[in-house]
Amino acid sequence: MATYSSNEFRSGLKIMLDGEPCSIIESEFVKPGKGQAFVRTRIRKLISGKLLEKTFKSTDSVEGADVVDMNLIYLYNDGDFWHFMNNDTFEQLAADVKATGESAKWLVEQAECILTLWNGQPISVTPPNFVELQIVDTDPGLKGDTAGTGGKPATLTTGAVVKVPLFVQIGEIIKVDTRSGEYVSRVK
């Protein structure tokens, strides 16, 4: 497997750390006035999902993680597993709760997701950046209730709760940014 020098660290790079595949979230090269240069990184462990900060000397190198990112279509959830299909080979893969994690609330049938595999097993699921979901429960917006810039909580078909503007009603379909969990717009 390839090795990466700490000078090659970039956001999104997958490396092995303590026997577990990790993804670099951000890296900063620091060259102090006195002493050796180093790289300060924020890393997410792909299996456990833990965030950690680690400092590497400029001469350090680490092994690249043998992980594969695949674009797959989300099919359905049977209660224990979320099932995905490769559109080219029609091969199906099942991801458990540990792999889907927080992204389960953004999975919409027939949406293209990124499944990260390590040793042939799914370890993380990345939903599309934007999803369109229907509102199943929210407080009614009263006419003239526009004081303030706040919103109201709305429950979506997947169970996710998003803060929406006061004019949005039950039954409407909205567009949500899955990276931040924020309301983007109404869908016509």
From Swiss-Prot:
Alphabetized Gene3D superfamilies for the sequence: 2.30.30.30, Nucleic acid-binding proteins
Q: What is its main location?
A: cytoplasm
- One Pfam family linked to the record: EFP_N
N6-(3,6-diaminohexanoyl)-5-hydroxylysine sites (modified residues):
K34
Claim: Cytoplasm is one of the keywords in the record: yes
Specify the domain of life of the species encoding this protein.
Answer: Bacteria
Which pathway is it part of? Protein biosynthesis; polypeptide chain elongation
The alphabetized list of GO BP terms reads: peptide biosynthetic process
Molecular function terms, GO-annotated: translation elongation factor activity
Q: Where in the cell is it found?
A: Cytoplasm
**UniProt modification remark:** May be beta-lysylated on the epsilon-amino group of Lys-34 by the combined action of EpmA and EpmB, and then hydroxylated on the C5 position of the same residue by EpmC (if this protein is present). Lysylation is critical for the stimulatory effect of EF-P on peptide-bond formation. The lysylation moiety may extend toward the peptidyltransferase center and stabilize the terminal 3-CCA end of the tRNA. Hydroxylation of the C5 position on Lys-34 may allow additional potential stabilizing hydrogen-bond interactions with the P-tRNA.
Q: Name one GO cellular component term.
A: cytosol
Q: Which UniProt keywords apply?
A: Cytoplasm, Elongation factor, Hydroxylation, Protein biosynthesis
Please state the span of the N-terminal signal peptide per the UniProt entry: none
Query: What family is this protein classified in?
Result: Belongs to the elongation factor P family.
Role summary: Involved in peptide bond synthesis. Alleviates ribosome stalling that occurs when 3 or more consecutive Pro residues or the sequence PPG is present in a protein, possibly by augmenting the peptidyl transferase activity of the ribosome. Modification of Lys-34 is required for alleviation.
Q: Which HAMAP family match?
A: EF_P
What protein is this chain from?
Elongation factor P
Originating organism: Hamiltonella defensa subsp. Acyrthosiphon pisum (strain 5AT)
Q: Upper taxonomic classification of the species? A: Bacteria, Pseudomonadati, Pseudomonadota, Gammaproteobacteria, Enterobacterales
